Amino acid sequence: MTDTTVAVPGAVRLNTATVTQYLSSQSSLVASLTGDGGGRRRAVLLRSAPQWDGPAEPAWGEGRTAGIAVAPSPLAVHELVLDHLAARRPGPPVLVVLTDREQHELDPAILARVHKLRIDTVDGWDVVREAFGARQIDPRLKDVNWAAEALLDATPPGSWPAVPGGWLSRQYALTALAQRRLRLGRYDTEGGPRRPGDDRLDAQALLHWSTRPGAPERLLTLRGPERAGLTAFLGEEDQAGLAGRTLLALVDAERGEDAAAFGLVCAALWQHAEPAPETYRARGRAERYFGDRPPATGDQLDALVTVFGRATEEHVTTLLAAGHRTAGTDADQAREARRTTGTVLDRAAALARQFGAEEAVAASPVLRGGLEARFTAVGRALAAGDTTAVADAVRRLENHRLAAEPEESARIERARMGQRLARWLATDPPTDALTVADALRRHVAETGWADLALEHIEAGGDQGPVLKAAYDTLGTRVRDRRRQIDASFARSLAAWTQSGTQPGSMLTVETFLDRVVGPLVRRGEERRTLMLVLDGMSAAIANELGEELRRSWAEFDPLPEGDTPYRRAMAAALPTVTAVSRTSLFAGTLTKGTQADEKRLFPALKLWGGAPAAVFHKDDLRTETAGETFGPALTEALADGRTHVAVVLNAIDDRLAKEQKLGDGAWRIDDVPGLRDLLRVAATQGMAVVLTSDHGHVVDRHGTKVDPAAAPESARHRLIGGGPLAEREITLSGPRVIWPEPGASIVALWDADSRYTALKAGYHGGASLAEVTIPALAFLPFGAEPPKGWRELGDQRPVWWAPEETGKAPLPDEYTARPVAATASAPKKPTAKAKKDQAEVARMHHGALFDVALTTEGDDALLTPTVVSRTETLVTALLDSETYQAQLGGLARKPQQEQVHKALTTLLDSGGTLPVTALAQRVGMPVTRGVGFAAVLGQLLNYDGVQVLETLPDGRTLRLHAALLREQFALGAG
């Protein structure tokens, strides 16, 4: 672009943009400019300094072209015009003659033959107005003396887009110019599909622009006045503001490509780092990165870089989120976002080293150094054994922007698992259980979860020395406690099996079908059963798969026994090997056998009552054609609407024989081939799904080989032989021992870290809790009417697993005081004074394991103390409170207070969280009315807009916040 200089008074030097824009604005010239004028030649006289350094025949727009010539004298004008019109001069049909001569100096006959019959004067702003299709121009825009020429020079092909309303404002014009020059917004040729709001010129847009290769140089190549003007415009408050000023100062210092990385370091230094001499020294080095012309000094510079750092963190956070979109047209943009983010973070780390800002970076919520520092903080907290400090450290770790990155997910989950194990150990878990049944129930509800958390940690560990050491110590403590628990369980198991007593109410592998599946058939339930037997699935894996399944299925306790429903477990047959325990499962009696025996015995069980039933093994899943999901026999059984189906899935057992899980210790539905497809069919068919196993397993992470006194029969059991038992062995005998024959005696390893045979990923056959416990999970599709006796389960995670999600733990049964009647007669309705006193009791004793309620024995009797549960006291005080009564009075249709009482009691006893359908079932109403009942509860409890009763994001689970309940209804602090 050329400078605008004065040749003679009244004549300015025109450039290509001005001339072409002028020609485009002349509608009478369009045909000739495009060659559609039938060969008609036109001459145009423009007042200009007779100088031209542009192309002799510029081409622009859609096939438009013209010739340009200069005429410093009247004679030159005459000759050029006449020669062109007479076609003696070659070139396009339109010739533009640039001259500084006055009109009276020219022959009127010449003027009569040119465009407009005169020498036309080009007003740059008129041309700009025409280019934007405007009627008026903002006077403030005309005050920008460099803008007209810049707008004309930057005119895009096809001209500028028409301005809305006909008013060309300064904001609109300079925004369009900046977008065109910097290739932003509608002129971004590299950013993919445009989205709403992409035309903005805020700090985020400029940060995005600065990360493009070569983008900052586009600003530096502009002429001085235009570059300075656009820089000032972009730094205005309505545009990119202070952050934009800072970024453009970096561009001016030729460091624009580092802007985003520099901003992250600035955020660490000026926002997050603690004031310290090292911080101030690093700030000084960072300030010099602006070169000789910083955008400000002193406090003003501090303010600039603080705002810039904040904007940069927001930008990188947006990029990180964009990098997670992998579907459809977003995939390419997501890949580009990940590339950009990686480049920026790497460069920021390099700049931090250059500035000596490593300690400041440790406080960053965005930079990798900050993430590593937070992992280290978790390690220190775990090493200190302070569960509160661990919770704070894990929370800060989860809040780091990089914590959501897929490559960090397993590592973050390990930190959570470490927190959970620390909380578990803090409860000082007892090592003994009263009975085998108690131990099995506890394993599914507690110790199996500890096994799950431990496996996650040991699958990956951590490369950071502090966290690695903390995991090592934590793992050792957990294994020691689990070893004590397993030792106690093995003694109980040996005593029970030797005594030969019946299991009683305890679920066992041989009674499972009769007690769980049989009632569905005997009651004439129309619903079929799909039993999925995941060979070798431990309680730890079952709990993990169960949590994933609960997102799409409702889980039930299939047994009607006991006051509180819970996830069930059953005892395996002994030894805990497939030939014994799985065959016993399918045969409905203690026995040993093969797949052929299972296929024969399972459908012959009397419990089917003549209904068809079939069991399918690994080979039955093999397809014969590309379009099939399962083998033909399994496909037919699933689709016939009559057959009860059992399918054995071997992924877990097969994995034990091959390799350990490394890095990510999680088991997911998709890790078990065929499981998701089978679940999909079951949902479509409305089948009840029972997820179980034939035995569990132990994982070998620290195993040692035990030299057996007799040849081993499996990795974890042997026959009775000479010599004393080893420390980690126990003798099992009695009717539950089926190998090598019923009633035999075997020796089994109870220690999870021991084996007899060669090293593998894991083993079974022994007497540990993880091997003997068989988890049994029952599911129905959401909204399905449950079979009689099936009770929907709430959150099954132990309270130490996720206390922030599960609410307060319900009191253990043995510590819950039962109401004790003071007299044989039922107490009368309390008086107003008694109600007040009882509410006071609730406030005074909310922290106790049990409360003392006051009841009356007669109209004039003294108040008599009665021991009641803490939950009962709280609910009674709530229902009698003035606030609750006012809420109840505002309802047009009032619910039965007995149902409200039972619902609140159930929620509190369940830790505060329960599915809507489960709540309806516990209250004694149809599950279809659960949603409506929950809405009424919300109206009663969510006083003054506070969410005392909350519906979780899944749309089907309620959470009652006991602390808020006490606060809102003035029942005392929780």
Curated annotation (Swiss-Prot):
Residues 835-974 are annotated as: Not necessary for Pgl+ phenotype or antitoxin activity. Disulfide bonds: none annotated. Deletion of the C-terminus (residues 835-974) still allows this protein confer phage resistance and act as an antitoxin to PglX. Induction: Constitutively expressed, not induced by bacteriophage phiC31, probably part of a pglY-pglZ operon. BREX systems (bacteriophage exclusion) provide immunity against bacteriophage. Part of a type 2 BREX system. Previously called the phage growth limitation (Pgl) system, it confers protection against bacteriophage phiC31. The bacteria allows one cycle of phage infection, but subsequent cycles are impaired, protecting the original bacterial colony. The system undergoes high rates (10(-3) to 10(-4)) of phase reversion, i.e. loss and regain of phiC31 resistance. Probably an antitoxin component of a type II toxin-antitoxin (TA) system. Inhibits the toxic activity of its cognate toxin PglX. It comes from Streptomyces coelicolor (strain ATCC BAA-471 / A3(2) / M145). InterPro entries: Alkaline_phosphatase_core_sf, BREX_PglZ. Identified by mass spectrometry as a slightly larger than expected protein, suggesting it may be modifed with a low molecular weight adduct. GO terms for biological process: defense response to virus. It comes from the Bacteria. This is Alkaline phosphatase-like protein PglZ. Belongs to the alkaline phosphatase superfamily. Disruption phenotype: Strain is no longer resistant to plaque formation by bacteriophage phiC31 (a Pgl- phenotype). Keywords: Antiviral defense, Toxin-antitoxin system.
